A protein has these predicted regions:
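Short glycine-rich phosphate-binding loop at a beta-alpha junction
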Residues: 51-59
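Conserved small/polar residues in nucleotide/adenosyl-binding loops
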Residues: 1-5
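Short histidine-centered catalytic/ligand-binding loop motif
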Residues: 20-29
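Phosphate/ribose-phosphate-bearing ligand recognition and processing surfaces
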Residues: 62-76
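Short, well-ordered amphipathic alpha-helical segments that serve as non-catalytic structural scaffolds
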Residues: 30-46
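Divalent-metal-activated hydrolytic enzyme cores
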Residues: 75-120
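Electropositive, glycine- and tryptophan-enriched low-complexity nucleic-acid-binding patches
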Residues: 9-13
Length: 120
């Protein structure tokens, strides 16, 4: 996920592995329910304005050869968490490249807000 305030030019990105930490879980950026609010808080602390924040979401691909019982994949759960967390934080989504069966490599230019994606 890339988030940037185009007015101030302040931006950053995160990558989380799991959607949520569960009851009593450690507060770590590897979880989406922690990583997204942490990134937004850091951008605001650096001078970004919440109303100006724009997000781009990438990933959520199902890169394993098996589908879990019930058909829900970790990638789909991560995408759902990302979208939900952005709504909760009041951050507008401007683009997404999610799902599929391949991983992604991402480069984010915080100066102009461009994001380059390579499918692996």
């Amino acid at each position: 996920m890339c988030i940037r305030d185009p007015i101030s030019g302040i931006g950053g990105m995160n990558h989380f592995l799991l959607p949520g930490r569960g009851p009593g879980g450690e507060r770590s950026g590897r979880y989406g329910d922690v990583a997204v609010p942490l990134l937004v808080a850091r951008l605001l602390a650096l001078g970004a304005a919440r109303n100006d924040l724009r997000a781009k979401v990438f990933g959520g691909g199902h890169v394993l050869s098996t589908v879990p019982a019930g058909g829900r994949t970790l990638g789909a759960d991560n995408v759902q968490m990302a979208m939900s967390a952005l709504r909760d934080e009041g951050v507008r989504l401007v683009s997404e490249d999610v799902g599929g069966t391949r991983g992604r490599k991402l480069a984010f230019n915080t100066v102009d807000g461009t994001a380059l994606v390579w499918r692996l």
